[in-house]
Amino acid sequence: MTITPQQLIALLPLLIVGLTVVVVMLSIAWRRDHFINTTLTVIGLNLALLSLYFVGQQEAMDVTPLVHVDRYAMLYIGLVLVASLATATFAYSWLENYPDNKEEFYLLVLIATVGGILLACANHLASLFIGIELLTLPLFGLIGYAYRQKRSLEAAIKYMLLSAAASSFMLFGIALLYAESGDLSFAALGHRLSDSYIYQPLILSGLGMLVVGLGFKLSLVPFHLWTPDVYQGAPAPVSTFLATASKIAIFAVVIRLFVEAPMADSEALRTVLTVIAIASMLFGNLMALTQTNIKRLLGYSSIAHLGYLLVALVAVQNHQLSEETVGIYLAGYLFSSIGAFGVVSLMSSPYKGPDADSLYSYRGLFWHKPILSAVMTVMMLSLAGIPMTFGFIGKFYVIVLGVKAELWWLTGAVVVGSAIGLYYYLRVMVSLYLPAPKALNRDTPRNWASTAGGMVVLISALLVLALGIWPQPLIDVIQQAKIIL
């Protein structure tokens, strides 16, 4: 097989992040320096983002039988890189006074980013599986990075065991699909699964197992049990990555799979997805109502957000609006989550004990840090889907898609779930403006806004507001990022 310059350009983001992994590894071997390794990581991720401009100058192409680079892949590569950049930036201040080795953190983030980029380009079940494993394996180390704290270690072990079980389900499902169809590329599966062929028992079993594996990775009900514990136990910057990059990359490949291989034509699969979506929306929101830990609350709310996104998966036959809805919702969710977890990261440090994730830590924050409180308020409003924030645009798209596809039960569940969600997001907001307790158990650095993490949080808040008022520029970009069949 010959590699042409065009193919190399199409793979630029993947190659640049892969090269950054090697450079950071050599830098650690040569000399441990936290600042240098962070800088190398950030430069590598920024170069990968810039390289998307050159990728965009080319036609969509199959670089290899496993990888297809088009505008759709570019959009999600961009979102994954932004999430990874935010994670690396928050990690710098979080790790500043970390007593053990700091540099490996960035190495693990970069390897997981390579997995996310591969998933965004995957058009074959083999690259889907490799991408998911490349994304998941570094997370075992990242979740347990604060291993001196029992919660972090427990979360890592829990995630590792359950993730291994989910991966085995997924692999067995892929094997069953291969046994029946003889090919694993999405396009070939699309041809083979057409008409009555999709009702074969082996095909249905394979699809069922694939749904189990992917449902775990996306933390959908009933495969969600790890989510609150892992979000709570993981260091705050890792929770940012878990909530954003891993979900975005996996959902991107799932949408491509469902568009190219008409899986949603199976009535049984659509029914299963509808039940999972309604259960995720209601369970995620109801469980979040009673939480006093902000990371657990955001963990449960992420279950509900993925439930809302399943509306687009069930309505995938209307695929142009489906793809647009997913792009807009995930972009809004990305910026809102970066802001919310960023505030938690800024208030946390591994040498002070566990992260500042109790709601009590945020009580009266407004009276000490008014701008930080304003940022957190904007993020909660966006996650709740309140007008004038970008989160509202995403929620609006989901409801419009549900109505157009005549999915009345799902649309009703979105409305009910959003109403429940409003209550617990308001709880977080209200606690920020209550009278401050006399003994403040947490505080952020005085100059938080001039730190790199502070700037990322402020930019996220401004983007959420600006795109909430005038979302058209981003909508235009997302409309161009279509899957071309």
Curated annotation (Swiss-Prot):
TM annotation in the entry: 8-28, 35-55, 75-95, 104-124, 125-145, 159-179, 203-223, 235-255, 271-291, 297-317, 326-346, 383-403, 406-426, 455-475
GO molecular function: NADH dehydrogenase (ubiquinone) activity; NADH:ubiquinone reductase (non-electrogenic) activity; quinone binding
Membrane topology, from the record: Multi-pass membrane protein
The UniProt record lists the keyword Zinc: no
Catalytic activity entry: a quinone + NADH + 5 H(+)(in) = a quinol + NAD(+) + 4 H(+)(out)
Subcellular location(s) of the protein: Cell inner membrane
Pfam families membership: Proton_antipo_M
Highest taxon of the lineage: Bacteria
GO biological process, one term: ATP synthesis coupled electron transport
Keywords: Cell inner membrane, Cell membrane, Membrane, NAD, Quinone, Translocase, Transmembrane, Transmembrane helix, Transport, Ubiquinone
InterPro entries: NADH-Q_OxRdtase_suN/2 (IPR010096), ND/Mrp_TM (IPR001750)
Quaternary assembly: NDH-1 is composed of 13 different subunits. Subunits NuoA, H, J, K, L, M, N constitute the membrane sector of the complex.
Recorded family membership: Belongs to the complex I subunit 2 family.
Role of this protein: NDH-1 shuttles electrons from NADH, via FMN and iron-sulfur (Fe-S) centers, to quinones in the respiratory chain. The immediate electron acceptor for the enzyme in this species is believed to be ubiquinone. Couples the redox reaction to proton translocation (for every two electrons transferred, four hydrogen ions are translocated across the cytoplasmic membrane), and thus conserves the redox energy in a proton gradient.
This protein's name: NADH-quinone oxidoreductase subunit N
